[in-house]
């Protein structure tokens, strides 16, 4: 079979030999997991959040997640991060959405692949870069407000929601708190303004 050449007269092998990946900026890739469960009485939906141990957003509550290793798929990274940060294993994750807004992470350009799972309630244990891992009851979720509560540690997170004019709710925006706010574990009430993105 004849080697096909491009307009510069190069075969694919020649092209790849001189190709320089450094000519293009490369974003980092992360994963986040939206893990939901019903409580044992099947009367209330809960969401799993971790408390960040380090910057950025130190001490703030967020979805479990982290960076994808160079030799792993996003699914493999999601499984690994979920186990490292919460102790949960053997959870079937479904890919939900890819977030690629250029300024979504203060460190660098990051593309995030989000996964979702609905599981039976089970114990969680913080590890790796998670300071704590807790189930929060979703006590209110409507067009105006989202309220999450963990009664055991007396934590309430309240978001005032604002719609943008579009069509689809970004389920992950509400799990990230606004930058620069420290949240003490024993805080009885946390007020935070948040914009829910629609697209």
Where are these regions (language model features)?
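Entry/capping segment at the start of metal-dependent catalytic domains
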Residues: 4-14
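N-terminal strand-loop-strand
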Residues: 12-62, 75, 90
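Unchanged
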Residues: 68-92, 96-199
């Amino acid at each position: 079979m004849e080697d096909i050449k491009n307009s510069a007269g190069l075969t694919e092998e020649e092209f790849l030999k001189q190709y320089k990946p450094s000519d293009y900026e490369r974003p980092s890739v992360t994963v986040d997991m939206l893990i939901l469960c019903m409580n044992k009485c099947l009367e209330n939906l809960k969401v799993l959040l971790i408390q960040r141990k380090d910057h950025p957003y130190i001490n703030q509550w967020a979805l479990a997640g982290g960076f994808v290793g160079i030799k792993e798929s996003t699914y493999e990274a999601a499984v690994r991060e979920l186990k490292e940060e919460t102790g949960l294993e053997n959870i079937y994750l479904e890919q939900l959405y890819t977030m690629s807004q250029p300024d979504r992470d203060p460190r660098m350009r990051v593309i995030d692949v989000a996964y979702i799972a609905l599981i039976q309630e089970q114990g969680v244990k913080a590890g790796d870069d998670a300071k704590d891992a807790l189930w929060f009851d979703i006590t209110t979720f409507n067009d105006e407000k989202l309220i999450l509560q963990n009664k055991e540690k007396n934590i309430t997170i309240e978001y005032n929601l604002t719609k943008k004019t579009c069509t689809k709710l970004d389920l992950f925006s509400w799990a990230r708190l606004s930058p620069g706010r420290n949240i003490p574990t024993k805080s009885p009430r946390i007020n935070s303004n948040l914009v829910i993105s629609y697209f």
